[in-house]
């Protein structure tokens, strides 16, 4: 409906100069097939149609490839769905509120944007870990749907080229985590099943790093690999 409203507004503006009048507002049709059936007319032929990917599919893509534009869009959709404005402020407020509803101590979370690019964002490793815990074992089973989007070490998404050396190969195929990459900040938050079959959640964050320094990402990957190999039973 938002797209239809925008189209109608632009049509009114363009038509004014040509002496055309376009009625204000947009009405939702019951559907061409239903309308045709009610009037006894032949059903129209569909010339073309486009269907959006589902929200779940978009969330999977966002997590897999770390799509910042999609993250911002999801944030605004969440804002509208919770009665807030579809603005940046509405989106960040919605994310913080939903994190709190999931059991995360969200009172100290500071968000300047949703995708995580802004340097003013402040989220602790504990808050990321609690978010993953809510997704994996929390009472709201709806959150489980996003777990498939977590990249898998050495196999998919932003982790597809990692976990290939001797120090991290033990985590390949086992570590599932969302990456975070800025010039001086790196993060890896996710979950892994260890050698004893226990589900472990984790979040590693490196701040004040030398941009592009060798070993930064490998350090996070080695830490997650150690968790994958844990076992004392």
List the predicted regions and their residue ranges.
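A small/polar active-site loop signature that marks catalytic segments
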Residues: 1-144
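C-terminal soluble interaction/assembly domains
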Residues: 94, 104-233
